[in-house]
Amino acid sequence: MRFTTVAFSLIVFIVIFSIFVANLASLIGIDKQLSNRLDAAVSDGQTREHERLRLDDSPNHLMWFLQISDIHISMYLDPARVPQLVEFCNRTVDIIAPSVVLASGDLTDAKTSNFLGSKQHEQEWRWYHEVLRDTNVLNKTVWLDIRGNHDNFNVPALQTRQDLFTNFSVQGRRHTRSYMQQIVKGGERYTFIAVDASLDPGPKRPFNFVGMLSLNETQHLINLAERSRQLDTNYTIWFGHYPTSCILTPGLGTGGIRNLIGRYREVYAYLSGHFHTLGGAVPRMYTLQDEGFLELELGDWMRHRRYRLGAFDHGHFSFVDVHHNQWPVVLVTNPKDALFQIPGKESFEAMMHSSHIRLLVFSPAKITECQVKLDAGSWRDCKRVSRELFVVPWEPAQYKRGLHKLFVYVLDDDGRSRMIEQQFTLDGTRLRFDFLAKLVLMYDTNKVFQTFFSVALIVYLVPLCVFRIWHTLVRSEYDRRGTVVKPRLRTFCCGSWIRKMWILSTVDRLMLPIVGYCLYLTCGPWSIAYALPASSNYHLCQ
């Protein structure tokens, strides 16, 4: 009786204390200097106002780019990844002609031959380097790559012999970690800020699933954002391998990196990879963060051969995720998809006063048909304004209330067709993102893991302790002929489960090790191993 009461109390104490410590650490972990700089960024941002541009049939004020993520070039798996990456760099980049290509991490696989361990293979990095060199893609566009957790496996320190990203990537030779790239097109400045949240040093698999920004790296990112403002940037995209929910940021408090990104009004979106759409369970892993920017996780190239086309059109950001070799590629930029409206940064008034529906169309063959239809209206032919821009006049005043549907049909000279449907609104009607997508992207991963662990611990141990206490009371009351009785199994719908739990709770040789093991998991190291290569010391990992 005494043991079970103590054990039960200890379980409750550990769970409550761990939650308290986690939240307390977030509250007291706010660096005052960082906080002051972010407050200054907000004040400065309130004085900046974008010029309101009219959405007509002009090809100006338009820029588009591509994103590819989680390539996982491997010595042991799926040899088609490399030749299809060659095809992407040759054919897709040539057809779409993006201003920028973002390669957001996990460029190589870095696994051992048994797929259990991790190792940086120089051959995988050579293949990546040779693809970019042989396809001449670096002379066609700006290629911005960043580390992923696989690119950082078994790396004892950055810029060492084991840090192959530095030697074989495009940006690794120029930038130690996070960096900024600004391009100018049509007189407008577009800035891309790369976030390197990889661990330093980089441990072996599987100990670097979550990224972290040190205080110095956070200061560096703020410096990049401030420099971007000084260069009078119009629109900014942040990108990295880890989603924001997977990045620890000591010094930024509970808001984390989202608090940093959201302080800059010119930031429209954060683009990432890493989660692989949870194995296809969340194929549309998108959300609008409370801080006022879109967060968009991209499905992987590794298995699904996905890439993203993003565009800024007259101050409005749109995107579409595409399967490799899926042609034609169609992206409607006006009216914008209602789900991805960014309040405070994109103007419904601009769409309301626009004169044309606008869409980008790309295909290896000549486009022979491009038509649009609004709601139950008739199909209307689009006019080609430039190589990729198609427009058609419309009357937005007819659609100023509620949600409406836009249909697009495109046919090319080789007989390939694409039919898309999207909803739009001109009055601010909001659509809801998928619940799982919001859960994964808006909540801190470490807190989600802590919650799941705490719930599992309670579900696993509390019934055992309750039945143990109940059994002890029954036995003591039986000796005194008391009123505490055993459960009547016929009155319970889970009689078989109760019987098994009751018996288990009475066998000390089973009950005590189970409770002890579970309590150990809350405070003891889970493994003792070499977390870093060529290390002379063991590391305790929990």
Feature map (PLM): residue ranges:
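Short acidic, glycine-rich surface-loop motifs adjacent to enzyme active sites
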Residues: 104, 225-247
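Acidic, histidine-bearing metal-coordination/catalytic regions of metal-dependent phosphoesterases
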Residues: 1-100, 133-142, 327-542
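Short N-terminal helix/helix-N-cap motif within the alpha/beta-hydrolase-1
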Residues: 73-76, 112-113, 155, 247
